[in-house]
């Protein structure tokens, strides 16, 4: 199959079946496509849609982002995970204001210098918003290429990645680049999926090596799954009426800049902290433990509830410590486990 036929098959499929009504495809701009592409780096389209709508409603442009606080951005990102993405958006908005007078740049060399943006994301932003000729190589596109060309190897292998870039550069059409890129992403997301691909309806099936061999599972090679390490954390839930004591996390490992319950590596540390705050440890209530899965470890969370009859001098608010009100919540970023606990209190589970 020639490069032209490959791209034409993808374009024909896109015109008939491609996604054309996603929120970021309507009245699209460099800004809206940028936000969507950052969200989609680690998130499915289905999960990203409500967050995107809410984000654009609150931050319709670069200026509104610059006029906000990081806490406001993290608040709207809460629950989506991978919070560095939100921080990078906020940092980028400040850079764009300073270097480009608040206008999102339309030069590849400028876009790729923004935090959290690599070659593929920069190409996606320019091709999808302005139809500029820039190939993309996200996870969906990589999967299509290794199966179609029968390329054996790990996707993280730099030699494999270089080979895939050479291929996608050669088959991406100069005209209709945006539609081709969207078509490739859509085929990867809906047909050439990781498990049990729908090869019978794929527009590229006739010359796809994986389909001819009937061995789609061979491509790409999978990393040997490692058992994720287990970690334990103790949350101290300080509650006064409808208010909960939260502090901004400063640790580098997880949830930096998000507001959390006081957390400790073991129960002994937690009890020492309570004694320092003159809290009777006999009033502690053990809540139901649960776990939260990260990409690199599993965190077992043991919450301990303390109901305060009054607010003591140890719990005074400042910009890093607040009483979070369940009925009138402040606009701050919350990790998903903290959200989960607060939601359960809202439902009167505890």
From Swiss-Prot:
EC class of the enzyme, as a word: hydrolase
Pfam families in the record: HHH, HhH-GPD, NUDIX_4
Molecular function via GO: 4 iron, 4 sulfur cluster binding; 8-oxo-7,8-dihydroguanine DNA N-glycosylase activity; adenine/guanine mispair binding; metal ion binding; oxidized purine DNA binding; purine-specific mismatch base pair DNA N-glycosylase activity
SMART domains cross-referenced by the UniProt entry: ENDO3c
Keyword Iron: yes
Chain residues that bind [4Fe-4S] cluster: 192, 199, 202, 208
Alphabetical UniProt keywords: 4Fe-4S, DNA damage, DNA repair, Glycosidase, Hydrolase, Iron, Iron-sulfur, Metal-binding
Swiss-Prot/TrEMBL cofactor(s): [4Fe-4S] cluster
Active site feature: 37
Hydrolase among keywords: yes
Reported function: Adenine glycosylase active on G-A mispairs. MutY also corrects error-prone DNA synthesis past GO lesions which are due to the oxidatively damaged form of guanine: 7,8-dihydro-8-oxoguanine (8-oxo-dGTP).
Protein name: Adenine DNA glycosylase
Species assigned in the record: Buchnera aphidicola subsp. Acyrthosiphon pisum (strain APS)
Gene: mutY
